[in-house]
Amino acid sequence: MPNQFLSPEGDLENYFVDEYWLIDQYVGDQLWTWGQNAQGQLGTNDTTDRSTPVTTFAGGTDWKQVSGGGSHTTAIKTDGTLWIWGWNDFGLLGTNDTTQRNTPVTTFAGGTNWKQVAGGSSHTIAIQSVDFTGF
């Protein structure tokens, strides 16, 4: 039987659900996360599983979009910066290495024009704003 839990303050705005973990984004732009954390995908600066919602280690109230895949999490802040954390085999965090990150870090690509991001089981794809002319 499903269990009801007390949500953090605010209305749910966006969420991402994986097989073993969950991230909610609430109005006010805070990220709350819980579930399996073996690869640091909760962003809590450790690998301890959580049965109750906690905010990411980076905290803050300026998250615009959240997504994830496999065992990593991706998010864009309202200033357009791209943040990513968790499992990093294959270099899927975009940090120019394969080191697991237990807290949110910016990608190697940097920049502040990120518009959308999504993660797969072993990859990440993101759209960065560019000026172009179609023909």
Task: Mark where each language-model region is.
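Enriched but not universal
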Residues: 1-28, 129-135
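Acidic glycine-/aspartate-rich tracts in secreted/extracellular proteins
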Residues: 30, 36-39, 59-60, 79-81, ...
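Short glycine/serine- and acidic-residue-enriched loop/turn motifs that recur at repeat junctions
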Residues: 32-51, 86-102
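Conserved core positions of repeat-based scaffolds
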Residues: 33, 72-75, 84, 123-126
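Thr-biased low-complexity repeat/linker tracts and other Thr-enriched repetitive architectures
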Residues: 48, 52-54, 58, 62-71, ...
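Blade-level signature of beta-propeller repeat domains, shared across WD40, Kelch, NHL, RCC1
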Residues: 118-132
